[in-house]
């Protein structure tokens, strides 16, 4: 009897332990019991040498529900955002500016190579200088010969000097040839770089390192979404950035104790007392904070076949710079020249490719040969008004991006949407069928309402430029642009996210029979017909004020 009791007790403990573990795994889903949402600006800021990184507190309930984290990166002119990778897939939207982005795929070849012509330009300049020196030497020798006519001894000395000079020139020429050959062998090669500009959406898989550089004439601003609940993230749901250079600070507070940006501007104790860089304690220790920093210096030097001084530079020892550094001079690397005609040609190619995909449909997507791993297309521009998928001359326009027009999103299971609404324009009330929506306000303002399953408005707020808010899956939402118009970008946590509308020509109400509407809402059949057919627009709706203004 006692043995049976002990066995039952052990079995109960094991069962409870398994149940607790299962509940901990499902905790992100249980975080979606939300009573209130809020649109807000970033909670934390890290000041860097050539820019800043701002992050939203991912421990807030709405971020935990959506399984995402977000940051905003500002890179000043001639600033370099150092290479890093993340434990979660990223979707990046370029809000402002232009620059260059490079993504490193392990095992792929370096397809960008410095031409021999560019490397020979430097040698030609050196040879030109040598010729000028030889001409000057020849003139000096001629003058010496005129003087040597008066004295035989002087002529003999002159001949000896000329002979020695020729021998030195021959020796220098022989030494120069292997140096030129060595320079030819050491031409710069690297993986593909991509031009980025306002309106671009860039997809970065988990674990893929990337860097970015601002070579434009204004600040480069980007908003990053980290899909931490993705299947590609095998760690916990804390966003992690692994930097491969510099002495970076932690962008996301793992303890969830977010510091207001106002405090960051005034300086947090031991962290922001300097204009940029690591805390003073770590600076005194001379330890870096990138991936190389944790390795033994001697072992790292042996692995890379370099001296220990170079290894210490990789580790960021005694380096006070963090994530974004200022480039001295210009950043010179191999990239194809781009003129106006090339940009127009690239845009036409993208439009043609998109039309072909729409015509061929899923057959092109399923053959598995459209793109190789090393040539994945990572970006698509959805800022061009001509690219709009939905347009109303009195309300605004909406552009969507999914796995059909950017195939890598099928792998990341993300999609995006960009909208621009005129003054008082309305985004039809709707719900997201299969995704959460993370909305960033690019410009303007709007009134936004979000309703939960109990009919409660858990968000009723006027959102402003620079704020971000989350609309959970299946929650009803309506947006109306303010006096300044409303321009936004929305990250969607599904590769082909779609919505169901509550108003308009393709709405839920339009699909119901008249009698169902009349009985469901206690209205007459005539009123039901008006409810169904009064609105002929689809998603971008003009307000009554706009219609009166047109009349």
From Swiss-Prot:
Highest taxon above the source species: Eukaryota
Ranges of biased composition (kind: Basic and acidic residues): 339-350
Residues that bind Ca(2+): 194
Keywords attached to this entry: Allergen, Disulfide bond, Metal-binding, Seed storage protein, Signal, Storage protein
Signal peptide: 1-20
Gene Ontology terms describing biological process: cotyledon development; protein hexamerization; seed development
Record PTM: Proteolytically processed from a single precursor to produce an acidic and a basic chain that are linked by a disulfide bond.
Cupin type-1 domain residues: 37-312, 380-529
SMART domains: Cupin_1
Tissues with expression: Expressed in seed (at protein level). Expressed in seed.
Cystine residue pairs: 32-65, 108-374
Pfam families, sorted: Cupin_1
Cellular component GO terms held in the UniProt record: extraorganismal space
Gene3D superfamilies noted in UniProt: Jelly Rolls
Matching PROSITE patterns: 11S_SEED_STORAGE
GO MF term list: metal ion binding; nutrient reservoir activity
Comp. bias intervals (Polar residues): 282-293
Motif (NGXEET): 367-372
Keyword Metal-binding: yes
Function: Seed storage protein.
Protein family: Belongs to the 11S seed storage protein (globulins) family.
Stated name of the protein: Prunin 1 Pru du 6
């Amino acid at each position: 009897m006692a043995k049976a009791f002990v066995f039952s007790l052990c079995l109960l403990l094991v069962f409870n332990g398994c149940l607790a573990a299962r509940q901990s795994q499902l905790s992100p889903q249980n975080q979606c019991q939300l009573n209130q949402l809020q649109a807000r600006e970033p909670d934390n800021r890290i000041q860097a040498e050539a820019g800043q990184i701002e992050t939203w507190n991912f421990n807030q309930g709405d971020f935990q529900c959506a399984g995402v984290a977000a940051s905003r990166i500002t890179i000043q002119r001639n600033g370099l955002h150092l290479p890093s990778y993340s434990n979660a897939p990223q979707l990046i939207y370029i809000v402002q500016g232009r620059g260059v982005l490079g993504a490193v795929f392990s095992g792929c070849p370096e397809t960008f190579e410095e031409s021999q012509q560019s490397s020979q330009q430097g040698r030609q300049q050196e040879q030109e200088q040598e010729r000028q020196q030889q001409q000057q030497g020849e003139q000096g020798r001629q003058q010496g010969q005129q003087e040597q006519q008066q004295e035989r001894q002087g002529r003999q000395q002159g001949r000896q000097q000329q002979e020695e000079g020729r021998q030195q020139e021959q020796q220098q020429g022989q030494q120069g040839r292997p140096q030129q050959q060595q320079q030819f062998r050491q031409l710069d090669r690297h993986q593909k770089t991509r031009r980025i500009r306002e309106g671009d959406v860039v997809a970065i898989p988990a674990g893929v390192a990337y860097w970015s550089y601002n070579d434009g004439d204004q600040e480069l601003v980007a908003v990053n979404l980290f899909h931490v609940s993705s299947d590609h993230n095998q760690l916990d749901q804390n966003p992690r950035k692994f930097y491969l250079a510099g002495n970076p600070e932690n962008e996301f507070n793992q303890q969830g104790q977010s510091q207001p940006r106002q405090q960051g501007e005034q300086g947090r104790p031991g962290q922001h007392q300097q204009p940029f860089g690591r805390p003073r304690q770590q600076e005194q220790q001379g330890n870096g904070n990138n991936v190389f920093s944790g390795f033994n210096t001697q072992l790292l030097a042996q692995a890379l076949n370099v001296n220990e001084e170079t290894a210490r530079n990789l580790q960021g020892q005694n380096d006070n710079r963090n994530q974004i550094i200022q480039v001295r001079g210009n950043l010179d690397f191999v990239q194809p020249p781009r003129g106006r005609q090339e940009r127009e040609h690239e845009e036409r190619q993208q439009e043609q490719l998109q039309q072909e995909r729409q015509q061929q449909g899923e057959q092109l997507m399923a053959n598995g040969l459209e793109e190789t791993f090393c040539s994945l297309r990572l970006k698509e521009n959805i800022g061009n008004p001509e690219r709009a998928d939905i347009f109303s001359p009195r309300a605004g326009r909406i552009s969507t991006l999914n796995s059909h027009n950017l195939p890598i999103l099928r792998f990341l299971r993300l999609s995006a949407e960009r909208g621009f609404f005129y003054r008082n324009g309305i985004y039809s009330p709707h719900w997201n069928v299969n995704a959460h929506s993370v909305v960033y306000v690019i410009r303007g303002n709007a009134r936004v309402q979000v309703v939960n399953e109990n009919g409660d408005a858990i968000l009723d707020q006027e959102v402003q430029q620079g704020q971000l808010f989350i609309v959970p899956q299946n929650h009803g939402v309506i947006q109306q642009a303010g006096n300044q118009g409303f321009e936004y970008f929305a990250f969607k946590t599904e590769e082909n996210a779609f919505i169901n509308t509550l108003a308009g020509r393709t709405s839920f109400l339009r699909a119901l029979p008249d009698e169902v509407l009349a009985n469901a809402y206690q209205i007459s059949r005539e009123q039901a017909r008006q409810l169904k057919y009064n609105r002929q627009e689809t998603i971008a709706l003009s307000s009554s004020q706009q219609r009166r203004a047109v009349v």
